[in-house]
């Protein structure tokens, strides 16, 4: 209850930070050097880098209340993302980008968050505005290059440095040892069984492969290949059993039947990078059956192993390799629960906006990292 109350207060505290005293000139410079504020920012950054998003949020909020400045606000945004609060991070980043136009950091982070959240056109407009104000800024140039060169985009180099980071920090679950340095991205995968297992393309795994999975919050756990499942194997898929349960948050898995052809749909996937990352959302309309199989056409871009979500943000399936040039997906459906006695007729959930879809699915898709032992 305490955690829910604290999270619910983040938006109000962010608004309070926006209304903090606007110091100017020498006064602002002096306030920025206040020992207490400097210590708070350093502690918050340390908490963030070790994956303690809750503590980092608290300390960045306190620093933001002391001075209306971009450094604490950017920390708040990254801490909110580390905590899975995409919508709050996006809303506050819009403020930071608009208020602190003298520096490119807020604008390029806003462009990145818009892009991974499926709002490509708005992301391009924001980034173009940043480049117009700061044409020689190396951070803006690096973001421009990353967003233009790959889809989904992959952060590397300057974009993984602490002060400019466009990704979460890694955090091992259950005090496990981290993956070794040679571990490489092999595929996307989808969390199932309430976060105890993951489904992925079997082709991503070798015969002597050690495996880890990592979500969009940087949370990481080792995994092992489960016994063969005929229904999955027939579609070239395999199941991983996770060493530690990976939280799925408010995300739901579909039960009953798959969405009808022509229904709005989304895919959430990571780019082919080895570092922690925020996944990217793509959207369109789900297609119909592929010939006489139980596969369906995706109808829009989606990387193999990506999570397929319906218009309510519910996990409905996993993307597969292209068939006849078209991306396909396989429904992953649970049996319908037995109706409870005396229950009222179910009410269908309302459709969600893309930022809600992203936040709902953020914990459902994972990076698969592998090393091949001799």
What is each model feature region?
Residues 42, 75-76, 109, 143:
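Canonical tetratricopeptide repeat
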Residues 30-66, 75:
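Alpha-helical segment of the N-proximal tetratricopeptide repeat
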Residues 149-175, 248, 274, 315-374:
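C-terminal cap/linker of serine protease catalytic domains
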Residues 175-202, 220-222, 304-307, 353-355, ...:
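A conserved glycine-rich beta-strand in the N-terminal activation segment of trypsin-fold
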Residues 193-235, 242:
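Catalytic-histidine neighborhood of serine endopeptidases
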């Amino acid at each position: 209850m305490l955690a829910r109350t604290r999270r619910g207060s983040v938006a109000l505290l962010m608004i309070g930070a926006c209304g903090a005293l606007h110091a100017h000139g020498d006064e602002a410079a002096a306030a920025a050097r206040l020992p207490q504020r400097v210590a708070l920012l350093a502690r918050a950054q340390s908490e963030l880098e070790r994956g303690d998003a809750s503590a980092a949020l608290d300390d960045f909020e306190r620093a933001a209340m002391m001075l209306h400045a971009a450094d604490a606000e950017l920390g708040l945004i990254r801490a909110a993302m580390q905590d899975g609060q995409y919508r709050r991070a996006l809303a506050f980043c819009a403020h930071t980008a608009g208020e602190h136009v003298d520096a490119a950091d807020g604008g390029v982070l806003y462009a990145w968050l818009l892009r991974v959240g499926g709002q490509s056109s708005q992301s391009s407009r924001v980034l173009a505005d940043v480049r117009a104000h700061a044409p020689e800024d190396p951070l803006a140039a690096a973001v421009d290059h990353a967003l233009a060169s790959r889809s989904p985009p992959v952060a590397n180099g300057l974009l993984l440095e602490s002060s400019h980071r466009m990704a979460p920090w890694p955090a091992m679950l259950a005090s496990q040892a981290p993956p070794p340095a040679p571990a490489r991205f092999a595929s996307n995968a989808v969390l199932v069984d309430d976060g105890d297992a993951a489904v992925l393309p079997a082709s991503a795994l070798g015969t002597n492969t050690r495996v880890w999975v990592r979500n969009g919050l940087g949370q990481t756990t080792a995994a092992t290949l489960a016994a063969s499942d005929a229904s999955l194997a027939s579609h070239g898929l395999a199941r991983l059993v996770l060493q530690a349960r990976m939280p799925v948050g408010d995300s739901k898995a579909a039960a009953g039947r798959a969405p009808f052809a022509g229904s709005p749909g989304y895919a959430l996937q990571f780019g082919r990078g080895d570092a922690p990352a925020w996944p990217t959302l793509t959207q369109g309309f789900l297609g119909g059956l592929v010939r006489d199989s139980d596969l369906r056409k995706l109808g829009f871009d989606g990387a193999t192993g990506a999570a397929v979500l319906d218009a309510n943000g519910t996990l409905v399936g996993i993307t597969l390799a292209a068939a006849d040039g078209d991306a396909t997906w396989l429904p992953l459906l649970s049996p319908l629960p037995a109706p409870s006695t005396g229950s009222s007729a179910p009410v269908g959930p309302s459709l969600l906006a893309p930022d809600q879809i992203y936040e709902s699915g953020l914990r459902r898709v994972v990076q698969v990292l592998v090393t091949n032992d001799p």
